[in-house]
Amino acid sequence: IYDFAILLALYTGLRIGELCALQWGEIFNGRIYVSKTMQRIRMNSGKTEVVVTPPKTDKSNRCVPIPSFLLPIVERFKMQSGYVIRQDNGNFVEPRLMQIKFSQRIKAYGIRQTHFHTLRHTFATRCIESGMDAKTLSEILGHSDVKTTLNKYVHSSFELKQTSIDKLPFVYAI
């Protein structure tokens, strides 16, 4: 289930808390309806507790398309109800545990350690590289401002720079 969670995050750009709070009733017609997030908060007693709350902003309430190639995989994991990412006993997987499982997975694959949120950045960068416009990407990510998407999430690569520069028309005589 953790590999499925990683794949889902990598191809939808969901935040870790949104993914952990996601229930099967919020996935239908090839779409994910994001309306809540899961987080661990510190209580007055000093202990922490996992809570499910509305997302950060109104823009975070959104509909995220699932790539067509991923739909058969989603169907393979689909259950009638409950959390999409759940433990064997049916309980939810909280963000802290998801991060631990993610770290274990990437270490096993020989990938340098990074945070689960990197999947969201990777998703954003690959979307722009594939030609998605910034406004559409910003809406998929649930950002209130396109500038947030471009300045914090999209990372230009040399290959993208080269491809972009090669699109310039040849107009000068040599």
Question: Model-derived features: where do they sit?
Answer:
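Basic, Lys/Arg- and aromatic-enriched nucleic-acid-binding interface segment
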Residues: 1-16, 20, 60
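Short, basic (Lys/Arg/His-rich) helix/loop patches that form interaction surfaces
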Residues: 2-3, 12, 64, 79-92, ...
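Extended hydrophobic-aromatic, low-complexity segments
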Residues: 3-5, 34, 42-45, 74-75, ...
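Short, surface-exposed helix/turn micro-motifs that flank interaction/cofactor sites
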Residues: 20-21, 138
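Phosphate-coordinating loops and pocket residues in cytosolic domains that bind phosphorylated ligands
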Residues: 21, 29, 151, 155, ...
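Conserved tyrosine-mediated DNA breakage-rejoining catalytic core shared by Y-recombinases
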Residues: 21-76
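Catalytic-site neighborhood detector that most strongly recognizes the C-terminal catalytic loop/helix
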Residues: 38, 71, 141-166
